[in-house]
């Protein structure tokens, strides 16, 4: 059986990167919440 996690830097950036987050209203809320929490890393 193939494992579910097949790492790819490109797919990781496209799905969870900063620009992907900023592209949607929900994603912007995620960034805002992480900023409010004082996260060192906001996105992948």
UniProtKB/Swiss-Prot annotation:
One of its GO terms (cellular component) is ribonucleoprotein complex. One of its GO terms (biological process) is translation. InterPro entries: Ribosomal_bL34 (IPR000271), Ribosomal_bL34_CS (IPR020939). Keywords: Ribonucleoprotein, Ribosomal protein. Belongs to the bacterial ribosomal protein bL34 family. PANTHER family: LARGE RIBOSOMAL SUBUNIT PROTEIN BL34M (PTHR14503:SF4), MITOCHONDRIAL RIBOSOMAL PROTEIN 34 FAMILY MEMBER (PTHR14503). This is Large ribosomal subunit protein bL34. The lineage of its organism: Bacteria, Pseudomonadati, Pseudomonadota, Alphaproteobacteria, Hyphomicrobiales. The gene is rpmH.
């Amino acid at each position: 059986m193939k494992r579910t996690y097949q790492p790819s830097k490109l797919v990781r950036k496209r799905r969870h990167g900063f620009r992907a987050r900023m592209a949607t209203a929900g994603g912007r809320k995620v960034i805002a919440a992480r900023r409010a929490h004082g996260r060192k890393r906001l996105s992948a």
